[in-house]
């Protein structure tokens, strides 16, 4: 069991920067009340966040940059530093050429292989609408948008 976990961690580190993903999501949680993007309410992980921002990275990064600048100049705000950190972390992912948006905005996974066990408790075939991106053409990171029978 321990060896399997270690192998999994090694694979994850090789294919995608997972530790930074955790940091990215922590920072996002601290400042999400300052963001007025539509996807904020449906973002439950760093994967969701990146998939959303990749949908129109120029728009989101410009807005986030402006918001961070505005908050940094506002002496009453304590979120400026965190917004700037969120911008830096997101920018690092977006400019990483290994990230590619999936060509189709939604795809169907009939095998449910991308579902985690707790999300597919019935073990029945379900139609899953996915969005996401690939990292280095090796790892596909999906966000589950909808599950239907």
Give the ranges of each region predicted by the language model.
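Extended, amphipathic alpha-helical stalk segments that mediate dimerization
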Residues: 1-149
């Amino acid at each position: 069991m321990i060896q399997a976990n270690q192998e999994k961690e090694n694979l994850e580190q090789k294919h995608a920067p997972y530790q930074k993903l955790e940091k990215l999501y922590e920072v996002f949680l601290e400042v999400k009340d300052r963001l007025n993007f539509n996807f904020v309410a449906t973002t439950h992980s760093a994967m969701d966040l990146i998939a959303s921002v990749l949908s129109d990275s120029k728009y989101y990064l410009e807005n986030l940059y402006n918001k961070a600048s505005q908050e940094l100049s506002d002496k009453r705000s304590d979120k400026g530093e965190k917004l700037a950190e969120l911008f830096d972390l997101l920018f690092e992912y977006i400019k990483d050429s290994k990230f590619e948006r999936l060509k189709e905005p939604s795809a169907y996974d009939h095998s449910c292989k991308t579902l985690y066990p707790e999300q597919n408790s019935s073990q029945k075939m379900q139609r899953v609408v996915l969005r996401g991106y690939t990292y280095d053409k090796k790892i596909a990171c999906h966000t589950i948008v909808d599950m239907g029978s």
